[in-house]
């Protein structure tokens, strides 16, 4: 599996001078809003705003600095919901992040974004999907699996000491709960969070509680947490 480091995003952001959104309730802290289903919003300590797989829930009002999309299914690609974008805002999808078998890493001035393996099941071609490992200032890491089943690369991620990892567990289009638990134990993040639990629902408390791992963190849809 090949990797390429791309500096284009970083250069364009620096030249165009992206604006910032103040982190609500805590400037100087990284904050993450789980919007529901497979959608996340991160506000960095510097006030930069990152959206991952926009589609579900609320909280699309903050101007974006970066939009990440794991694959092409409609419940992950509603980028038009993000109407406000700072100058130089980039949209990075699986198409830019996985080219001829090479998983890209993008170095920005406020984060490093690494594409990793995803898909690997009958509903998601591994050649057309990525997960994202986002490294923020201070070394804080967030891993969003995207729609996936077990991948070979998850064993490598165990060596990265990931801080927060989101695991799909719907068992219909992706891995089921037992497989998600096994993947979470393999990656062994400091905090393992179930998401993308039931198609058509933002969140399911009963299913979230079935995600039985020692380092489980349940984050209901619409809840914002401080990454620490």
Regions found by a protein language model. Name each.
Residues 19-23:
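Sec/Tat signal peptide C-region and signal peptidase I cleavage site
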Residues 68, 142-144, 166, 193:
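Structural motif
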Residues 48, 84-90, 188-191, 213-214:
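A short helix->loop->beta-strand "cap" motif at the edges of active sites that frequently abuts
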């Amino acid at each position: 599996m090949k990797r390429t480091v791309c500096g284009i995003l970083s250069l364009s952001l620096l030249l165009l001078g992206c604006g910032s959104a103040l982190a609500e309730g805590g400037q100087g802290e990284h904050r993450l809003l789980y919007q529901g289903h497979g959608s996340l919003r991160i506000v960095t300590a510097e006030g930069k705003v990152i959206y991952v797989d926009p589609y579900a829930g609320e909280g699309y009002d903050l101007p974006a600095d970066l939009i990440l999309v794991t694959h092409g299914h409609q419940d992950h690609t509603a980028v038009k919901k993000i109407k406000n974008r700072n100058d130089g805002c980039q949209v990075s999808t699986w198409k830019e992040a996985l080219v001829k078998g090479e998983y890209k890493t993008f170095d920005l001035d406020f984060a490093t974004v690494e594409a990793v393996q995803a898909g690997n099941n009958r509903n998601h071609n591994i050649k057309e999907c990525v997960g994202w490992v986002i490294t923020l200032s201070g070394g804080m890491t967030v891993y969003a699996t995207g729609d996936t089943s077990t991948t070979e690369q998850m064993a490598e991620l165990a060596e990265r000491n990931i801080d927060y990892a989101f695991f799909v567990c719907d068992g219909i289009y992706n891995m089921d709960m037992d497989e998600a638990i096994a993947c979470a134990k393999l990656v062994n993040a400091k905090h393992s969070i179930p998401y993308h639990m039931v198609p058509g629902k933002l969140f399911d408390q009963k299913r979230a509680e079935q995600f039985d791992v020692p380092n489980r963190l349940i984050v209901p849809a619409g809840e914002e947490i401080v990454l620490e």
